Each structure stands twice: as structure tokens, then as C-alpha cells.
Amino acid sequence: MKLKEIALFNELAPGEAGEVEITGITSDSRAVQRGFLFAALKGVKADGAVFAADAAKRGAVAIIAGKDTAIADAGVPVLHVDDPRHVLAIAAAQFYGKQPEVMVAVTGTSGKTSVASFTRQIWAYAGFPAANIGTTGVFSPTRSDYNSLTTPDPVELHRVLAELASEGVTHAAMEASSHGLDQRRLDGVRLAAGAFTNLGRDHMDYHATIDEYLGAKMRLFNALLPKGAPAIIFADDQFSAQAIEAATLAGCDVKTVGRKGNFIALKRVEHERFRQHVEVRIGEEIFEIELPLAGDFQVANALVAAGLAMVTGVPAAAAMRALALLKGAPGRLDLVGATEDGAPAYVDYAHKPEALENVLTSVRPFTTGRVIVVFGCGGDRDKGKRPIMGEIASRLADVVIVTDDNPRSEVPAQIRSEIMAAATGATEIGDRREAIFTAVSMMQPGDTLVVAGKGHEEGQIVGNITLPFSDHAEVAAALAARLEEHLK
């Protein structure tokens, strides 16, 4: 592809510059190869302009940069633009070309992974070759690629979308994080519909205020969705009204789900230990659903996913039937096993205040004994949430064990102390493996254990090293050791 063939560059690269052949695109100078277009982006830790000369030496044939970015003596055309992140994403979309025919995106603080996964499963039930992209990876009929980035960078994203389309995927659901939206990573994705789950405290190390955080989320509706496109919004969150207003002002076709929903109205929920009986109204029809997942938040996620599926071609009755077959996303109230007495042990990705509150509230209805929680907070992230999560844990759980999460560059003991300051009666066990084994060993009949914070992750970040660690594997090992001891 020639540089001039990328629409945005027709005027930016006139004459000979436009005839340059582009063989690849990247914003990482270390990945540049001969013929690449390099985007010199300003980041939190580094300015891509510093690496422009190195990119040119490695073979970059043109450079994208901000209008206020000075790049001297690069030896290749430098294309100065108002929004280099947007231009990078659009260039990547045009370079790779193909996308699944039906693309949807879901934003919100919690539930994105589950909604994207559930939407894929409903589509698959209806006969569509479908995929989902997000925190746990890329999943389709031909692949299960695990990773840990909610919204991939635009070059990687558009490469994956092109591959999925080439593999026959026609429908794809993706997560839209506030970082991804703010950094224009989804620009160029041809979206058919979008969704909003909820909003709570998260990424306060990145967004200055909750209003700024909400504004980043709403970019899905006011910048990415075409006018008239369906916007599925969970109606029962404290920020639902703001989301509805933003989507309406953006010209979206707003459809709400939940107890206050006008598209899918939740009428009744009955909780059991591992499933829930749900009644919903769609138009004039009433549907009875046996949802094979625990937790009120999973009902919300399932309804948002059903809404997305219905506005993209799945009949209501088929979508409701599919809900009875849903499998939870990895690490989302994921039942690892149970003790010899039947007490269940879950792992959950809850690493934000509202998510921790949701999961602990969700297991209470089917817990006849104690709710036991093991959790910590990540280093180099929003410090303000630590005492908030400590208070939530001590208020909603009967036994609280505070441990290490991903301390990163911070001193683990300091992180724990900030949680413990508000976690009345909590026990502190820094070693996460020991904390999990301790929690499993104290379980009694009727108890429920939740190990929260890391969910599907397969490593623990200490300093700049990622050590192998899986909450799921450690809980399973602790349950096995307990059973072995019981059988002696």
C-alpha cells in the first residue's frame, strides 16, 4: 500500500512522499522494519519523538507526529497532524482492511469481559461464526489466544480483526476500556452497536476526576458509534442516566435493560448456589430463564449481552434460550471447586471497589455460613481505592485476609497497611499462596470463599518481574491438599 492510498495522507504527503510504499505500521520504534510507517506518540513515560531518528535508521519511510512535536533531521517525511493517535488507528484500519461484518463494543467499569464473552456465545448459539476480544484474550471458533490487555493498541487490534475476518468470523464483540477510548485505540473499527454496563471508581491514577473517566467511556457513543446505531445501556446503575443522556445526545438508538429497562425488563430473580432463575419481559412476551451463573451482576451482564445480540440479528427467543447455556468468562466468579463438605471456592477478577462489593454481595444470598475473602491491591495504581476496598471487605465479608496482589514497584507491606487501616478485624498475610491455603483450611460447611483481584491472570508482578502465579491453580491445590488431609 502506498502512503497516498491511506485517505488521511492524500494531502499530508503530496508528490513523491505519497508514492512511498508502506509495508507495516507501528508506534514502537523497536518493532520498525524497512518500509514501516512510524507513529511518534507522546506517552506517560516517554515521547515517541525521541525515537524518531532510531525508527528512520531501522527502515521507517514516514513518521506521524503531533503538530506541536518537533522532529529534526529524520531523513524521511514527517506528517504533522492534530491527533496522531486517531490518525494511527485510521491508518491501521485502512492498512489491514478487513473486519468482521458485525462489530460491537462494550464499555463500563465492570462486566466488559463477561458481556463480550456472553455476546459471542449467544451469537454462536444462533449460528454466527463469532469472536470476542478483551482482557482475557481473543476467542473464536479457531483460536483461544490468552493475553491481559483490555483494549489492544490499534495496530494489533486491526491486525487481529483482519485475521478474524479472513478466518470466517462474521460477528465480534470487544471490550472498550477508558484508556483504549481515550487513546483512540478503537478508532477505525466499524461498529454496529455499543453498550454500557456501569461506572465505579477505577483508573483514578489516569483520569483526574470521575467526570473525566465517564467522559472517556462516553466517547464510545459520541465519537465511534454511527448516528442511529443501537446503544444498549444497563438501566439500574447510578450512572445510567448520564450514559443514557450522552448516548441520546449522540444520536444513538438507546435501548435499556434491567429492572428499569425498556428493551429487556428484568421482573424477577431467584438465587440458588450455582444458578439463578430469571424472569424478563421483552415487548409483550415473558421469558423464564435458568441462568447457570451466580451473582446479580451476572444477570446484568447477561441482559446487556442479550441486548447486543438482539440488535445484531438474533431473535429474542433464541437469545433467551442461549442464556441458559452461558459459561462464565475466565476468572469471573469462577467456581474452582468445593471442600469435602460442599463449601464453594471462587476466584474473581474484582480489583475495584464496586466490583469487590458486587461479588461479595452476590455470594451472600446462597451462603449459610461465613463469607471469606482474600484480596489485595495492585501497586503503581490508584492508591485512593485501598482503604475503600478494605472497608468494603470488612463490611461485607465475615473473614477478611489481606494479601499481596501485583505490588509492582511499591513496597508490598505499605500497600497492605493502607488496606488494613480501614479493614476492621482483617488478618494480614503477605504471601498470596499462604493466604489462599489459610483461607481454604478454615472453610466450614456453609461457607463461601472468594479469592479476589487477579482472576484469570497467570502471573504476579513484583518489581519489574512477572512471577508465575495463578489464583485458580493455588485454590485448586489448597482444596486438593485439604481433601488429602481429610481422607487420612
Curated annotation (Swiss-Prot):
Residue span of motif Meso-diaminopimelate recognition motif: 405-408
Pfam families from the UniProt entry: Mur_ligase, Mur_ligase_C, Mur_ligase_M
Enzyme type, top EC level: ligase
Keywords on record: ATP-binding, Cell cycle, Cell division, Cell shape, Cell wall biogenesis/degradation, Cytoplasm, Ligase, Magnesium, Nucleotide-binding, Peptidoglycan synthesis
Residue(s) carrying N6-carboxylysine: 217
Reaction catalysis annotation: UDP-N-acetyl-alpha-D-muramoyl-L-alanyl-D-glutamate + meso-2,6-diaminopimelate + ATP = UDP-N-acetyl-alpha-D-muramoyl-L-alanyl-gamma-D-glutamyl-meso-2,6-diaminopimelate + ADP + phosphate + H(+)
Cofactor: Mg(2+)
Primary residence: cytoplasm
Positions that bind UDP-N-acetyl-alpha-D-muramoyl-L-alanyl-D-glutamate: 29, 150-151, 177, 183, 185
Molecular function terms, GO-annotated: ATP binding; magnesium ion binding; UDP-N-acetylmuramoylalanyl-D-glutamate-2,6-diaminopimelate ligase activity
Subcellular localization, as worded in the UniProt entry: Cytoplasm
Residues noted as binding ATP in the record, renumbered to the chain: 108-114
UniProt record, GO biological process: cell division; cell wall organization; peptidoglycan biosynthetic process; regulation of cell shape
This protein's record includes keyword Cell cycle: yes
Residue numbers binding meso-2,6-diaminopimelate: 381, 405-408, 453, 457
A GO cellular component annotation in the UniProt record: cytoplasm
Family: Belongs to the MurCDEF family. MurE subfamily.
Function description: Catalyzes the addition of meso-diaminopimelic acid to the nucleotide precursor UDP-N-acetylmuramoyl-L-alanyl-D-glutamate (UMAG) in the biosynthesis of bacterial cell-wall peptidoglycan.
The protein, known as: UDP-N-acetylmuramoyl-L-alanyl-D-glutamate--2,6-diaminopimelate ligase
Originating species: Brucella melitensis biotype 1 (strain ATCC 23456 / CCUG 17765 / NCTC 10094 / 16M)
